[in-house]
């Protein structure tokens, strides 16, 4: 089984250089799979993102693995292109591709500019922290849980399928960004305070329905 996690352009905004993002997320990733196929590897576990659903996250309460993809960030666009190519590749080469779409992940090793590391840094310095999207609802999922799911999903004897299969990786416990921030702000016992902005603004909802989530067995 080849497990593919490589990605460029992963950030809070997902709007890095499109050419560079496509080079890694589509062109080089496709070459990797073709090389593996030429060496008789037929099982692939590919990690993607809920950002593929894009604009649908504005008006859909929960996302299904059958939801239409409609990305609007460069990162989301690149991953959607690659996912579509994977579907065709699985049929043309009669291989098995299991696509795992990650919902918002936090924990050890994440980029220093993301929400939790930024919040932790401000808390340790005793400074105030601005939450710009407090009303946004996300399926916050710990990296430890993601690891358990990927190990379990790499067993292709589970949930057998013919060529192409999609599942979500999510702890399925949606909360607002405000609730998430307050939880960790309290843990860090900081002297600073949280400043909440744009509370009435329309935000995306990165929330999976229960039936689309891979359950560890």
Language model region names:
Residues 2-8, 44-50, 100-102:
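SDR active-site strand-loop-helix element
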Residues 53-54, 70-74, 98-115:
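Flexible, glycine-rich beta-alpha linker
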Residues 123-217:
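C-terminal substrate-binding subdomain of Rossmann-fold SDR/epimerase-dehydratase oxidoreductases
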């Amino acid at each position: 089984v080849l497990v593919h996690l490589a990605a460029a352009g992963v950030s809070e905004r997902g709007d890095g250089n499109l050419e560079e993002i496509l080079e890694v997320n589509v062109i080089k990733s496709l070459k990797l799979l073709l090389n593996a196929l030429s060496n008789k590897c037929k099982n692939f576990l590919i990690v993607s993102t809920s950002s593929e659903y894009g604009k649908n996250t504005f008006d859909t309460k929960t996302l299904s693995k059958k939801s239409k993809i409609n990305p609007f960030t460069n990162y989301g666009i690149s991953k959607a292109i690659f996912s579509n190519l994977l579907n065709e590749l699985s049929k043309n080469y009669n291989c098995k591709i299991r696509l795992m779409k990650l919902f918002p992940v936090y924990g050890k090793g994440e980029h220093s500019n993301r929400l939790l590391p930024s919040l932790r840094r401000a808390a340790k310095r005793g400074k105030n922290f601005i939450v710009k999207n407090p009303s946004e609802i996300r399926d916050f999922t710990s990296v430890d849980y993601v690891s358990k799911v990927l190990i379990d999903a790499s067993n292709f004897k589970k949930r057998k399928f013919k060529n192409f299969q999609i599942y979500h990786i999510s702890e399925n416990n949606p909360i607002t960004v405000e609730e998430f921030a307050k939880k960790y702000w309290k843990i860090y016992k900081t002297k600073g305070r949280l400043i909440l902005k744009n509370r009435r603004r329309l935000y995306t909802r990165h929330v999976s329905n229960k039936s689309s989530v891979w359950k560890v067995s």
